[in-house]
Amino acid sequence: MAIRALEGDLIENMKRVIFDVKGLVHPPNRIIAYPRFIPDSSGNRKRKKASYWKVYSLTERFKFLQRDLPHYVVHDPIFDTTLCEVPVEDVIKHYKPVEKLQRLRSSKSLSTLENRALQLAELLREKANLPWNALGISGSILARLSAASSDIDPIIYGSQNCLKAHAALENLLKHKRGPLRPYTQDDLKILFEFRSKDTAMNFEDFVRTESRKVMQGKFNGTDYFMRFVKSWNETSEKYGDVRYGNLGYARIRATVADDSEAIFTPCKYKVEKVTVVEGPRPAVSEIVSFRGRFCEQARANETVVAQGKVERVRDSKKNHEHFRILLGNKPSDYMVLA
């Protein structure tokens, strides 16, 4: 079975574990994805007769994998790091956000959360003038495992659609009587308690970046977290075209030269005037992350301090090499305004 898995999709294996897909580049016959919903008779998420636990932190996800699915944990030679790679032959279901939204639109019996997700999608489509196939709903709604406290996880596909949706969100958040609200200080405290479990950062630095993000907030009282993902025809990289080499760990101070890819997952910040505070010293030209929490983290001309893995990036097709900082799975990985 051939599966074209995209950031924000979910896949389910033969043991009924549900994984969230990361990125757009995957090895042959395997999908880079991490466990999100784990079957457990004592779980607090219900779907028909099955119970699940939702796993949040990367530490807990890897603990589960090492215990129950150790053969999924591999050192990938192309990415030069340890990843969870799900064999395609183990996948029994592929959940697609666009198809989920289509089903919500045609359904006659939606939950309160599903109805709210549909309303948010309709609002974005109208205000940003988007086609329906550019929008999807991911997360617990996609898996049919939402709880009363669940948030809404919309996804926008295609660069131009993403830029239009982002601009529409900015405008909507300015209307104090509208359905969208930015996070308050109290909301940010709750978010900080959740995020600080696996990303080290003090509250003041956290508020400086998170308070101005438009991809997260409240819609009619329900949290939303939006992802912006490039479409397949914008992604030419195939597995093996580019090789990544781990050169160690570093902390740098740099100026953001280009933030045009800051909203996307994965996000990218071109940097200049780089000073290495600690660690290896190759000429780093960008900061990259596959984690949504690092989107919209800084703007052009701002100075940042970032800490993460230093990687050599070799593109065999373009015969080009450069160096980057990858903000990944370690709690010590961070990027803050200087």
Task: Report the location of each language-model feature.
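Catalytic core of pol beta-like nucleotidyltransferases
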Residues: M1-S149, Y157-A338
